[in-house]
Amino acid sequence: TKIDPWFIERMKNIVDYKHKLSEYNTLEEIPAEVLREAKVLGFSDFQIGRFVLKTKDTNMEKEVLAVRAQRKKLNILPAVKRIPTVASEHPDLTNYLYMTYAVEGYDINYYKNEKSVIVLGSGAYRIGSSVEFDWCSVNAINTARKLGYKSIMINYNPETVSTDYDMCDRLYFDELSFERVLDVIDLESPRGVIVSVGGQIPNNLAMKLHRQSVPILGTSPVNIDRAENRGKFSAMLDKLGIDQPKWSALTSMEDVQKFIDEVGYPVLVRPSYVLSGAAMNVCHDDDELRRFLEAASEVSKEYPVVISQFMTETNEIEFDGVAQNGEIVEYGISEHVEYAGVH
């Protein structure tokens, strides 16, 4: 393989421990030292739930929470450490933090009832999106500080301005997962969490956090779900009598074929809760439709895939607005130079 044996041996350690976890069938069976070692090796609650509880569900929310509850019961909690920015040449008292199970203790003090908010960043960049999310994240942090709130940022992309530790009161350079965000919330006890400025990754966490009674600032997670879930959004437009291209939720290939016979090609395949239109495609024939439906179902396993009539050579006009208490306070209208659907 031309891969150094050192790396292969480390990977084998992880695979061996995966097999060890698979020997258990309930979380209560796992000895505390085994569960602790699994966390030290980097296994997430999601992975532990998958290997121990043998669940094939893609969501795993219930299982993740069960592993979390068992961890907390056994007092297996992550430590919070500072990231040194001066190569350990002298004590470094930055607010640049990460979580680990390899050691114990906190490098900082936590105080209850602090006036603070957590902002979830955009995570990994992809071509065509993310810089705007970073701009929004930085503005959210600055606004929170101006309003007298302690600003806490969770993001792991070193290319962003929001991961400059001078920008906020505390920066957690860590993953934007359900598990890790809950870890930070448990420690910080914020007044609220802002998910609306980080793009798709925070949006995907909104409903899960909402179900754990985490206060989400801004747009309600229920309304985020109504916009992100293609089926719910299209059904809402129908209910409100707002014109839209003909559409159908994917239930079976027979229903898809009936829809195609009715509207003809081209059609637009639209998965839900995806980053920057991932797996969203225009199909012009049966072969493309089958191929793109498989791709869309793969990236959007938990949510419906919607097929819409695709209108060619049409203008696309976009409206972005900010509302407060049911009234629009700021908005912008733009017309795309290219035809609708190109971007």
Residue ranges of each PLM-predicted region?
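Accessory DNA-binding and partner-docking regions appended to nucleic-acid-acting proteins
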Residues: I3-E9, I14, F43-S44
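N-terminal beta-alpha lobe that positions the nucleotide/phosphoryl donor
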Residues: Y17-E37, S44-T55, K62-L65, K73-H343
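Helix-turn-helix DNA-binding helix
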Residues: F7-R10, M60-V67
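Alpha-helical transmembrane segments of multi-pass membrane proteins
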Residues: K12, E37-A38, A69
